[in-house]
Amino acid sequence: MALGFLEKEYESQVLPYDDEETPVKLCEKKMLPIVTFDDGYSSNESLDIIARADEENRLGTKSLLADKEKLEQMDQLLGEIGSPVHNLAMPYWIWTPEFNESSRRYFVDKKSKKRGPFHLLAQKKQQFLDELPPVLTKVQGLLTGPYYNGETLGIEDIMIASHLWGLYVIPEFQFPNDLHRYLQSIGNLCKFNYHEDFWRQEI
């Protein structure tokens, strides 16, 4: 999203989720996404990547990184969003194009250690759906205008949108109208196309 907003050209390479060798080779850690810059520097820390790409600080990433209290508040908010979202969406995500049988099994085995068996997550779907309204209401209350910081899109909006967007795969879930408009506005400004990478070529 951030690279689209900043109009940065980049080449995307989708790695199988069970590819541990490539991330460790580039960044000494299995974590995605990874960006390798023109000077050869590679990073898998999203805010570091965006701050480096955003030389003019248009998204305010450097300002957020410099404000420890605000950064902690954002981390807490994203944790509150992530818990029900991931529990709901992971059983759906494993059937999206980036997963083959091997990487799907790897993902399920790894995530089940933290969240429990995926078939039980699917059975608890209504419980997780019921956990969403208070979290979404909190997000709505934090928007001081069309966006988190008022009239201008900032890094906080991209962080929030990247966590919420996965809910669009849940058939039984529908965003409140104002949050849907908020997310779609971010998507438009960032030229974001979900799963664009997987449909560049005919199969």
Q: How would you describe each model-predicted region?
A:
Residues 1-106:
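GST-like domain detector, emphasizing the conserved glutathione-binding G-site
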Residues 173, 182-203:
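Alpha-helical oligomerization segments
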Residues 79-184:
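GST-like fold's C-terminal all-alpha helical module
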Residues 14-16, 153, 199:
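Acidic carboxylate-rich catalytic motifs and surrounding loops in phosphoryl-/glycosyl-chemistry enzymes
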Residues 61-65, 148-151, 176, 195-198:
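Short, hydrophobic secondary-structure boundary micro-motifs
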